[in-house]
Amino acid sequence: MPQKKKIPFSRPYDQQNFNPPAPVMEVSLSIPGTQPQLQSVILKSPALLDSGADITVIPEQIVQQLQLKYVDEITASGYDGVPKQTFIYSVKLIFDDLGDFIVRAIASNNDHVLVGRDILNKWSLLLEGKKKIFEIK
């Protein structure tokens, strides 16, 4: 049964871990296709909503802990603009109030998930910078 979405979803920016403050929410990650009754490993991570990222990026540490298998390779560039060959992993992201997504993601040395436009484009995202809150509809 699909999870019921609770929209609109509103949260304050994370002012403790990001300077300047940024739109961050919690996400759970697991192996795609895992049945809920199978006691699968689910890891939680902060997730920065990053409209500058084409695709979602997950921490390498989570790739290792979930033992995700790579499904493809692409050439990707970070903010430095230097292209490099990188693996793509299939992963399930679970947003408690907004639904579940199985996506193709790349890994990085960050300690948090970067939610890219591959997911953000499924929502209407409003950044209220002056109020330091964000809303998803």
Where are these regions (language model features)?
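Pepsin/retropepsin-fold aspartyl endopeptidases
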Residues: M1-K137
